[in-house]
Curated annotation (Swiss-Prot):
Root EC class: ligase
GO MF annotations, alphabetized: ATP binding; glutamate-tRNA ligase activity; tRNA binding; zinc ion binding
The protein's Enzyme Commission number: 6.1.1.17
Subunit text: Monomer.
The gene coding this protein: gltX1
Annotated positions binding ATP: 241
Pfam families according to UniProt: Anticodon_2, tRNA-synt_1c
Protein's organism: Helicobacter pylori (strain P12)
Name of the protein in question: Glutamate--tRNA ligase 1
Function of the molecule: Catalyzes the attachment of glutamate to tRNA(Glu) in a two-step reaction: glutamate is first activated by ATP to form Glu-AMP and then transferred to the acceptor end of tRNA(Glu).
NCBIfam families listed in its UniProt record: gltX_bact, PRK05710.1-3
Length: 463
């Protein structure tokens, strides 16, 4: 098997979105799984729309999710001389020509074609032009598309694709200002970089016949193509910002782990048996572009949250502390290692994202300012206050380093007072945490420690 060489080639006109990252992941996995090469190319020939910030954000996103590319990043804006050489080569070989048709003439032609209910297209009128060029017109360069031929290629996702060249006009490869067009520079760079396999969105499927025309005209080897269907929302519509089509780095800010996001995106449009959870190593062992799905995949927040919760639960205390650094939450320095472990172990089981985990840390470590009204209204104060007073005294002799001792202290009150567990546990939870739900009470007491637990109970009794 020859060396697999893939690439990801975004345009820096906006931030890297989920669909783009998925494409990058597929290309990365295919190359790395076969000990091949994976390149990053920035397609920045549209100088008027390029953004340095967007280009840097793409690189930042790659670093975050761990996609390591080979060699230096290739910037198309630095390769204009190379493109000019190949345009001139096609002109010299009579495979391309200057077209002097003005925009006014082209618009008029299209209107006539529409009136005749024909597909609007350039009519190749300058294809064999040998006369004197009209004055005042900066020509474009068009490729001579072979006529009456069938361009066929076996797409790795779509299957056999066939297009008659008569459906194509002699498309532009260099604009009147000399700037080469997208299809031209993509073909040149893929060929010169030795790209063997192109995995990209199926919105590029219509570009492929044009690129094959160029590959053949320049005697370049044609790569294998895999055109992946787009990602839809759960209603079967195109992704919007509300449904997930946001900057990749927004997911980091929302508290998603890179392992979860990569796993989630790799499974959007690719399947392997019935397996859902994949480490990067497992993805490298299992990924094959032949298993890419031909039907659109659906973005599911529920699925992403489920995966993220899975990876969150498997993080150690030290790993979580590193991951939590970008998020603001209560100071943890007063907790001993055992309390810190217990806090994060208890809360990571109840959290789906790092952001949610940070909020829950605050909820536990910040003393309640107010108490959940609907729970408070249900309490029988005449019964509750003496129970909490008695328990507060009991805590003075309880070993707070032993959760079983804390649990025994609570059950002792229940047994001595011959009451239902909820009659005591609910007000105690309200006193400690300010609400009716949350982590277990023995965990809460252990994490808060004796001084803070007694302090919160006293505050509740006073209020």
């Amino acid at each position: 098997m020859s060396l697999i060489v893939t690439r990801f080639a975004p345009s820096p006109t906006g931030y890297l979105h989920i669909g783009g990252l998925r494409t990058a992941i597929f290309n990365y996995l295919f190359a790395r799984a076969n000990q091949g090469k994976f390149f990053l190319r920035i397609e920045d020939t549209d100088l008027s729309r390029n953004s340095i910030e967007a280009a840097n954000a793409i690189i930042e996103a790659f670093k975050w999710v761990g996609l390591e590319y080979d060699g230096e990043i290739l910037y198309q804006s630095k390769r204009f001389e190379i493109y000019k050489e190949y345009i001139q080569k096609l002109l010299d070989e009579d495979k391309a020509y200057y077209c002097y048709m003005s925009k006014y003439e082209l618009d008029a032609l299209r209107e006539e074609q529409k009136a005749r209910k024909e597909t609007p297209r350039y009519d190749n009128r300058y294809r064999d032009f040998k006369g004197t060029p009209p004055k005042g017109i900066e020509p474009v360069v068009r490729i001579k598309v072979p006529q009456n031929e069938v361009i066929g290629f076996n797409d790795g996702v779509k299957g056999e694709v066939r297009v008659n060249t008569n459906e194509l006009d002699d498309f532009i490869i260099a604009r009147s200002d000399g700037v080469p067009t997208y299809n031209f520079v993509v073909t040149i760079d893929d060929a010169l970089m030795g790209i063997t396999d192109v995995i990209r969105g199926d919105d590029h499927l219509s570009n492929t016949p044009k690129q094959i025309v160029l590959y053949k005209a320049l005697n370049f080897k044609i790569p294998n193509f895999f055109h992946v269907p787009m990602i839809l929302n759960e209603e079967g519509q195109k992704l919007s910002k509300r449904h997930g089509a946001t900057n990749v780095m927004d997911y980091q800010e929302r508290g998603y782990l890179k392992e979860a996001l990569v796993n989630f995106l790799a499974r959007l449009g690719w399947s392997y048996q019935d397996k859902e959870i994949f480490s990067m190593q497992e993805l490298l062992e299992c990924f094959d572009p032949k298993d890419l799905n031909s039907s659109p995949s659906c973005f599911s927040w529920h699925k992403l949250n489920w995966l993220n919760a899975h990876y969150l639960k498997n993080q150690s205390t030290q790993e979580l502390l590193k991951l939590l650094k970008p998020f603001s939450f209560s100071d943890l320095s007063h907790l001993n290692p055992a309390q810190l472990d217990r806090l994060l172990d208890a809360l990571k089981e109840r959290s789906q994202t790092l952001k949610e985990l940070a909020l829950k840390i605050d909820e536990v470590l910040t003393a309640p300012i107010e108490y959940e009204e609907k729970v408070l209204k249900k309490l029988n104060q005449a019964l509750v206050m003496p129970l909490l007073e008695k328990f507060k005294l009991e805590l003075n002799t309880t070993n707070f380093n032993d959760e079983s001792a804390l649990e025994n202290a609570m059950h002792q009150i229940i047994e001595e007072e011959k009451i239902k567990a909820g009659s005591f546990m609910q007000p105690l939870r309200l006193a400690l945490l300010g609400k009716g739900g949350g982590i277990g009470l023995k965990e809460a007491l252990f994490i808060l420690g004796k001084t803070e637990s007694v302090k919160r109970i006293e505050k509740f009794l006073k209020n």
